[in-house]
Design a protein with these regions (language model features):
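Short loop/turn segments that flank or connect secondary-structure elements
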Residues: 2-204
Length: 204
């Protein structure tokens, strides 16, 4: 269902309010172009929960040797996470910008050390939900969760590729959205998107 406003800009799905950008914007990560730059640019780490911090600390012995010397030193001195200026718990950074769990391939592409270890079967934790969800950002309120699409210039290539392939953000993010909210929630979102586009046919 939609919120009761003269101009629709949010959709209500269960106890969440979802930005229409998630439906209308095209998005498909193009790692060949961006090289995983979202892991190394920014002024704060990735938001995590206390449970995720504990899980990262639990698997740290398995991945610590995969990290750069600077990242290992930062973790030893300051831990895997810190509270940023907005009061959010976030992953630790190297040099104030690069996530400590970033690893680089010979071609310069960035990957998440946690996810690499998970894909290799070495750990049972994929990566923080906020990383999996990106470019979606969640804001928790007492009675609902706001689901917004963060637009960043380094992701322009993902918007271009998504448009070329006809993939919208909510479709690209089916896996992480289902991980966070559940299959029933995602199916309701997809059905709502179908009805929305029936009423308001996209121009693209």
């Amino acid at each position: 269902m939609t919120t009761e406003t003269e101009e629709i800009d949010m959709l209500q799905i269960q106890d969440t309010l979802v930005s229409l950008d998630l439906l209308e914007r095209h998005f498909l990560c193009d790692l060949s172009k961006c090289k995983g730059q979202c892991c190394i640019d920014g002024d704060a780490g990735a938001p995590i929960t206390e449970d995720e911090r504990r899980k990262i600390e639990e698997i740290l012995p398995e991945i610590i040797d995969d990290l750069s010397p600077a990242a290992q030193r930062e973790i030893r001195e300051n831990g895997v996470a810190y509270v940023d200026e907005e009061g959010d718990l976030v992953t630790q950074l190297v040099n104030g910008c690069q996530c400590v769990f970033t690893v680089f391939e010979p071609d310069g592409m960035c990957h998440c050390a946690i996810e690499k270890a998970w894909r290799a079967g070495r750990v049972d934790f994929m990566k923080p939900v906020s990383c999996h969800l990106y470019p979606v950002r969640l804001t928790e309120y007492p009675s609902f969760t706001a689901v917004n699409l963060h637009r960043w210039k380094i992701c322009k290539c993902a918007e271009v590729l998504g448009r070329q392939k006809g993939v919208r953000a909510y479709e690209f993010l089916r896996g992480p959205l289902t991980r966070r909210f559940g299959e029933e929630w995602y199916e309701e979102l997809a059905a709502t998107a179908e009805e929305y586009f029936r009423q308001y046919p996209p121009e693209d």
